[in-house]
Amino acid sequence: MTIIVTGGAGFIGSNFVFHMLKAHPDYRIVCLDKLTYAGNLSTLEPVMDNPNFRFVKLDICDREGVYKLFEEEKPDVVVNFAAESHVDRSIENPEIFLQTNILGTAVMMDACRKYGIQRYHQVSTDEVYGDLPLDRPDLFFTEETPIHTSSPYSSSKAGADLLVLAYHRTYGLPVTISRCSNNYGPYHFPEKLIPLMIANALADKPLPVYGKGENVRDWLYVEDHCKAIDLIIHKGKVGEVYNVGGHNEMKNIDIVKLICKELGKPESLITYVTDRKGHDMRYAIDPTKIHNELGWLPETKFADGIKKTIQWYLDNQKWWKDIISGEYQDYYEKMYSNR
């Protein structure tokens, strides 16, 4: 089987590449990535010499290039991780999110229609559902929860999801969609909460926390997410959406305090900054459907996963220190210096 993995040099995509090459050593994995600021080719160094792996630098919006790749590789399955994903950046510049997340998705599905595939899988987010109130811990997102987006990012992902389902109904394209909660683990880009706090804490820099840090997220270890997608593309029902959650709800401030504790850093590093515009209060996923239909359950408890994640960042400091130099510093100063 040949699988095209878009966005495979990013956080979740690269972990999925590693998982698939290990779990299915006879599969051919073709990684397509534009290598934007969040894509890092060095992440894929461990598999570059694998004869069943190929990397192609390509923008999913490049229709001619995508069609050429399909002609060459004749993929059986496409898994689309490629996306602009940082909410703060979407607030600053929505257009690139619409281009990549919606138009890029359309190009990939058009290629699937033109050349024929067994399965197209869209990797999406629980953010398409909006948020839940903090005072209703009994409420969870299900696959039937209406789409109610809060940011340009989540709106672009919701638009892509609706387009995927429309291609299924209109053209009969064999699609599935997964909507995950917040991922964490190795190779997470340092602009996101957990790696940002780890990197800053190690450097004894301020730990910027939006608002009062009361926002709640459901955390999913990236390896568990990869296993869920593996199951969906092999056994998931065509035309269906599957929620993938970690059963690990935590307040942002509690995560930051835990990171301080694990690294032996004082909580005095925590600095409360002006809240994000339209900041969602609580995400919580009900993964009953994927459990009942496919037998998937998250294996990693947050207490264990965060220890593994922190240790990975301690052991791989060159990887993230190379990233946070240069352009990233300009972005960081813009985001946090005057808040």
Predicted regions and their residues:
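C-terminal substrate-binding subdomain of Rossmann-fold SDR/epimerase-dehydratase oxidoreductases
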Residues: I3, H19, I29, L58, ...
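Short histidine/acidic/glycine/proline-rich micro-motifs that form metal-
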Residues: L35, N182-G185, N215-V216, R276-K277
